[in-house]
Amino acid sequence: MHPEPAPPPSHSNPELPVSGGSSTSGSRRSRRRSGDGEPSGAPPLPPPPPAVSYPDWIGQSYSEVMSLNEHSMQALSWRKLYLSRAKLKASSRTSALLSGFAMVAMVEVQLDTDHDYPPGLLIVFSACTTVLVAVHLFALMISTCILPNIEAVSNVHNLNSVKESPHERMHRHIELAWAFSTVIGTLLFLAEVVLLCWVKFLPLKRQAGQPSPTKPPAESVIVANHSDSSGITPGEAAAIASTAIMVPCGLVFIVFAVHFYRSLVSHKTDRQFQELNELAEFARLQDQLDHRGDHSLTPGTHYA
């Protein structure tokens, strides 16, 4: 009998521990996972936000809306302050200019003592000048009294300082000064220009026997007789021309003032409707917030 052949030598060392292969394969798997995904030292992901119930969501929405409403109210107050300041500045400049011009026009006008003025012309001219100066000085007085207080508040860089401004309480006085300076004062100024033209040019007329330096005496007499027969002197013609020009300008001014006022009122009305809609939305949210405990909520009614 032949002896049995020895088994072939094994490539693996039987004396090596079995745990070595498992540790090597585990390190390979860990390196593979670390190479494929995030590094092993990365912080864990934050937990998802907790579910918000419907009453809590209503409360958060209401607080956010009220915060936005507070900021919008402050912005609206600042816009009103800047608008009031601009109106007062424009009123003061316009009133000072037009009243000064009216005073100079009344003082510098030279009346012809030899001319027989119509009885009502000088009275109307004097009354118009006096009312014009009084209206503009009243608007200038309001602007001078209120404007420094508004300027002092507008120069302070603080959002809450708008409450210290008197523009809300003095709103009617500001609008009155604006109307006196821009509407009534401008119309009186146009009338003042027309009356000044009549007072200045009405005495100008050519004498019947006065020769003209550029024409022969015979021709001057013919022209003078023609002007006397027509009944319109050169001064009257100049006054009538100025009146014919100023009357359409006054009508255009009145139409523009009415159109501007209607457009401004329409814009303010639209803004009031928008604010009323916002207040209705606030009231709805407040009502839902007040009655959130009256309705029983199921556990599944959540907003993620």
UniProtKB/Swiss-Prot annotation:
Tagged with keyword Calcium: yes
Regulation of catalytic or functional activity: Oxidation at Cys-197 leads to inactivation of channel activity.
Stretches the record annotates as Disordered: 1-50
Organism (species): Mus musculus (Mouse)
Transmembrane stretches, start-end: 90-107, 122-142, 176-196, 238-258
Compositionally biased region (Pro residues): 1-11, 41-50
Annotated segments matching region AKAP5 association region: 39-61
InterPro entries per the UniProt record, alphabetical: CRAC_channel (IPR012446), Orai_sf (IPR038350)
Predominant location: membrane
SUBUNIT field: Oligomerizes in homomeric and heteromeric ORAI complexes. Native CRAC channels most likely consist of hexameric ORAI heteromers, implying that diverse ORAI1, ORAI2 and ORAI3 subunit combinations with distinct biophysical properties can operate in a cell-type specific way. ARC channels are heteropentamers consisting of three ORAI1 and two ORAI3 subunits. Interacts with STIM1 and STIM2; this regulates channel activity. Interacts with CALM; this may displace STIM1 and STIM2 and might thereby modulate channel activity. Interacts (via N-terminus) with AKAP5 upon store depletion.
Pfam families per record: Orai-1
Domain topic, free-text comment: The Pro-rich region of ORAI1 (residues 3-49) functionally interacts with the polybasic Lys-rich region of STIM1 (residues 672-685) and regulates CRAC channel gating at negative membrane potentials. AKAP5 association region (AKAR) mediates coupling of ORAI1 to AKAP5-dependent NFATC2/NFAT1 transcriptional responses.
Sequence similarity: Belongs to the Orai family.
Gene Ontology process terms (BP): adaptive immune response; calcium ion import; calcium-ion regulated exocytosis; establishment of localization in cell; ligand-gated ion channel signaling pathway; mammary gland epithelium development; phospholipase C-activating G protein-coupled acetylcholine receptor signaling pathway; phospholipase C-activating G protein-coupled receptor signaling pathway
Annotated tissue distribution: Expressed in lactating mammary epithelium (at protein level).
Required for generation of inwardly rectifying CRAC currents as annotated region, ranges: 3-49
GO cellular component terms given for this protein: basolateral plasma membrane; cell periphery; membrane; membrane raft; plasma membrane; plasma membrane raft; synapse
Alphabetized UniProt keyword annotations: Adaptive immunity, Calcium, Calcium channel, Calcium transport, Calmodulin-binding, Cell membrane, Glycoprotein, Immunity, Ion channel, Ion transport, Membrane, Phosphoprotein, Transmembrane, Transmembrane helix, Transport, Ubl conjugation
Site (Confers selective permeability to Ca(2+) ions): E108
Biased composition (Low complexity): 12-27
PANTHER family the UniProt entry points to: CALCIUM RELEASE-ACTIVATED CALCIUM CHANNEL PROTEIN 1
Residues recorded with modification Phosphothreonine: T298
Protein task: Pore-forming subunit of two major inward rectifying Ca(2+) channels at the plasma membrane: Ca(2+) release-activated Ca(2+) (CRAC) channels and arachidonate-regulated Ca(2+)-selective (ARC) channels. Assembles with ORAI2 and ORAI3 to form hexameric CRAC channels that mediate Ca(2+) influx upon depletion of endoplasmic reticulum Ca(2+) store and channel activation by Ca(2+) sensor STIM1, a process known as store-operated Ca(2+) entry (SOCE). Various pore subunit combinations may account for distinct CRAC channel spatiotemporal and cell-type specific dynamics.
Reaction(s) the record says it catalyses: Ca(2+)(in) = Ca(2+)(out)
UniProt lineage: Eukaryota, Metazoa, Chordata, Craniata, Vertebrata
The protein's name in its UniProt record: Calcium release-activated calcium channel protein 1
Stretches assigned to the Cytoplasmic side: 1-89, 143-175, 259-304
Membrane topology of the entry: Multi-pass membrane protein
